[in-house]
């Protein structure tokens, strides 16, 4: 029999022990309350005449009215056989007891209007606590053995939120400067015309001056190659000068015959370089106005432009006359 009971106990479902997950509440300035706050609230509510008191008075007055209606209209119609003969002499006393109960409740509900105000002088409260509770300052001096209950105090660490150092560091870390590039200026293209442009004068100088015309064997026109080759064959001078002393146009400046022969081709070269220079400057100006980075086109790859300007023609003649001086 005992073995059967032990097997039944082992087969029974174990009961899960429910442990309280809420630990003891530590006192802190955020959740602290006065240890005698419940007593203070109860004693203060005794002097408050509110909605609860009014409701209590109304209900008890209604009960008195119903008792009087029952006594006047219902008691004569009750047969005397239903009332015990021993209770007939006490019928008036029974009616009076039923009337005393609602009258007592009405008097209790009216007591806050006549009860003196409790100043809670027997409870040790600081002046700040009395002010928060709406109590007048205590007229009695504090007893030597009174212990005031106050919230725990913690040392406050100074905040650097409004200090000049924090404002300075925030300004230096967030505001962009003129030297630091902005995200909008990192990649400027045709798809973003409203992006700001950061260009220095040195970039303009480099882009315009680096595209000077230099008649090299790969970039010059075939007519220039032919003119230089014929001149060098007739004078016996290398068409592009010696490696140690290269000249501007590829011919030696000491040879008068080479200079006179090249003067014919110089006009076309100078005219082409002037046109390319004017085109580069106009494209650079348009690119700065439109917000697109300048991409000057080299002379050898530029579009062919008909030079019909009188100014370009006169400039070419002056260049050719200067070459004849040498």
Swiss-Prot record:
Q: Which GO terms describe its biological process?
A: mRNA transport; protein import into nucleus; spindle pole body duplication
Topological type in the membrane: Multi-pass membrane protein
- Role: Functions as a component of the nuclear pore complex (NPC). NPC components, collectively referred to as nucleoporins (NUPs), can play the role of both NPC structural components and of docking or interaction partners for transiently associated nuclear transport factors.
Q: Which residues form a coiled coil?
A: none
Where found in the cell?
Nucleus, Nuclear pore complex; Nucleus membrane
**GO CC annotation: what is one?**
nuclear outer membrane
Protein name per Swiss-Prot or TrEMBL: Nucleoporin POM34
Q: Which residues cross the membrane?
A: 57-77, 94-114
For bias type Polar residues, the affected ranges are 140-149, 156-170, 232-247
What PANTHER family has UniProt attached to this entry?
NUCLEOPORIN POM34
SUBUNIT field: Component of the nuclear pore complex (NPC). NPC constitutes the exclusive means of nucleocytoplasmic transport. NPCs allow the passive diffusion of ions and small molecules and the active, nuclear transport receptor-mediated bidirectional transport of macromolecules such as proteins, RNAs, ribonucleoparticles (RNPs), and ribosomal subunits across the nuclear envelope. Due to its 8-fold rotational symmetry, all subunits are present with 8 copies or multiples thereof.
């Amino acid at each position: 029999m005992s073995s059967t009971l032990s097997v039944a106990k082992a087969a029974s479902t174990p009961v899960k022990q429910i442990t309280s997950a809420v630990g003891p509440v530590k006192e802190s300035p955020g959740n602290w309350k006065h240890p005698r706050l419940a007593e203070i609230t109860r004693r203060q509510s005794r002097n408050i005449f509110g909605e609860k008191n009014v409701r209590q008075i109304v209900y008890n007055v209604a009960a008195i009215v119903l008792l009087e209606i029952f006594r006047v209209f219902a008691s004569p119609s009750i047969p005397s056989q239903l009332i015990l003969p021993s209770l007939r002499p006490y019928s008036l006393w029974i009616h009076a007891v039923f009337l005393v109960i609602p009258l007592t409740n009405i008097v209790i509900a009216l007591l806050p209007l006549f009860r003196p105000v409790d100043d809670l002088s027997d409870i040790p409260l600081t002046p700040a606590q009395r002010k928060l509770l709406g109590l007048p300052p205590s007229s009695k001096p504090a007893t030597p053995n009174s212990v005031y209950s106050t919230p725990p105090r913690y040392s406050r660490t100074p905040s650097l939120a409004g200090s000049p150092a924090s404002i300075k560091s925030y300004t230096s870390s967030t505001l962009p400067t003129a030297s630091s590039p902005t995200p909008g200026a990192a990649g400027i293209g045709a798809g973003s015309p409203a992006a700001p442009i950061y260009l220095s004068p040195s970039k303009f100088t480099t882009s315009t001056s680096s595209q000077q015309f230099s008649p090299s064997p790969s970039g010059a026109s075939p007519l220039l190659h032919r003119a230089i080759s014929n001149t060098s064959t007739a004078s016996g001078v290398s068409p592009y000068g010696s490696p140690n002393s290269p000249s501007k146009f590829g011919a030696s400046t000491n040879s008068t015959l080479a200079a006179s022969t090249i003067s014919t081709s110089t006009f076309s070269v100078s005219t082409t370089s002037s046109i390319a220079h004017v085109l580069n400057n106009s494209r650079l100006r348009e690119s700065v106005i439109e917000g697109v980075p300048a991409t000057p086109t080299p002379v050898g790859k530029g579009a062919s432009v008909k030079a019909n300007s009188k100014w370009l023609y006169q400039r070419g003649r002056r260049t050719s006359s200067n070459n004849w001086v040498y």
